[in-house]
Amino acid sequence: MASIDGLPPLREVIRAHGLSAKKQLGQNFLLDLNLTAKIARLAGDLTNSDVLEVGPGPGGLTRGLLAEGARRVLAIEKDARCLPALAEVAAAWPGRLEVLNADALEVDVAARLTPPIRIVANLPYNVGTELLTRWLSSDWPPFWESLTLMFQKEVAERIVAKPGSKAYGRLALLSQWRTDPKIVLTLPPDAFTPPPSIHSAVVHFTRLEAPRHPADPKVLARVTAMAFNQRRKMLRSSLKGLVPDIETVLREAGIEPTQRAEEIPLEGFCALARRLAG
C-alpha cells in the first residue's frame, strides 16, 4: 500500500504517533495492509460509492478503501489520539477523506454522504452489534447499498446461523430478513495488535430490496424478543403474554405451541407476526 499512497507502514504510524489500542474503546488495530486491502476489495466495486467507516484507528482500512477507488470516505473516529494519523491519510488523498471525531451512534450518517453508500468497517467490539442492529432496523430500503463489517467470529456466526443451532437467535433473524449475509473472511488473533483472545470474521451483507417475508417490523421485533429471551421454553409459555389464546394464534401461523424459538425459521416468525398484527 505504501507504494500506492506514499505513506509509511502502519507499525511506523502507530509508533510515530504513540498509539496503542484501548480495551475500553473495543479497539484492536489491524496493521497488515495486505489484509486491509483485501477487506476493501471484499466490499465490491467502490469507484462510484461514498463509504462510511466506523473506528478507522490509524487508518489501515481507510487507506485500502481509498486505494480501491472509493469516491469519498467518511471516517468516524471517537478516539482523538488517532486524528493526526488520519490527517496524514487525508493529505495523501486530497478531497476524498473526511474524518469526524465523534461517536458513530450519535451521527446522522445519511445526511453527510451521497448515494450510493457502502458501509465498510472493522467495528469496535463494544458497539458493533448495536450499530448493526440500527442499520438493519432503519426504514427499508435503507440509506446504504451493502455492509462489509468485521466482528468477533462468534457474533459473525450468530448472524448467519440457521434454525436448530445454538447460535440461532434474534441477530440471525434480523440480518437474514432483509439482507443476504455471508462470512467472507476469517482472521486469527495474531492479525491484530494487541491480539484479542478470539478469532474475528468479516461479514458481507447484500441488501434485499424487500424483506424475504412480509411482517410488521415492530411486531416481529417484539415477538422474537419474547421468544428468544426464554429460548429454552416452549413458545406457548414464552409468548403467553402476547394474546389471551396464544396457542390458537401459533397454530394459525403453522407453529406447534410446544416448539421452542430456536426451532422456528424466519418464515414462521414472520407468519406469526402477521397473525398478531391483524
Curated annotation (Swiss-Prot):
Keyword check for Iron: no
Name of this protein: Ribosomal RNA small subunit methyltransferase A
Query: Which SUPFAM superfamilies does this chain map to?
Result: S-adenosyl-L-methionine-dependent methyltransferases
Protein localization? Cytoplasm
EC supergroup of this enzyme: transferase
Keyword presence, Transcription: no
Q: Which UniProt keywords apply?
A: Cytoplasm, Methyltransferase, RNA-binding, rRNA processing, S-adenosyl-L-methionine, Transferase
Residues noted as binding S-adenosyl-L-methionine in the record, renumbered to the chain: 28, 30, 55, 77, 103, 122
Cellular component terms, GO, for this chain's entry? cytosol
Task: Spell out the coiled coil positions from the record.
Answer: none
Taken from the record, one Pfam family name reads: RrnaAD
Instruction: Provide the primary localization.
Output: cytoplasm
Q: Which InterPro entries match?
A: KsgA/Erm, rRNA_Ade_diMease-like_C, rRNA_Ade_Mease_Trfase_CS, rRNA_Ade_methylase_Trfase_N, rRNA_adenine_dimethylase, SAM-dependent_MTases_sf
